Amino acid sequence: MKMSLAEKVYLKLREVPRGKVTTYKWLAEVAGSKGYRLVGQILKRNPDAPRTPCHRVVSSSGKIGGFGGERSGKKIEEKIRMLEQEGVEVKKGVIDLEQYGFDFKE
């Protein structure tokens, strides 16, 4: 049975370890899509958080991105708190992808 893009996204996202983040673009590519914005929409409907850790997905610039369908406010504060609890350093809403990025090639 062929997996949907959403199923592929959720499956691949579970590979991102604690203390690392991936980007919408990297996640889209490894799931076989060019639609990184679509990945964001898929993650907004994540039925299995935190087992499927959508808080570990950020923008390609390292900016924190959205969370739970929001781009600011309490949800973003929660995302930052979750990442920091896992050892990811967030400076002014930005994460150093050189240090914390997981591009699925490791």
Where are these regions (language model features)?
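Nucleic acid-binding interface residues in structured DNA/RNA-binding domains
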Residues: 1-106
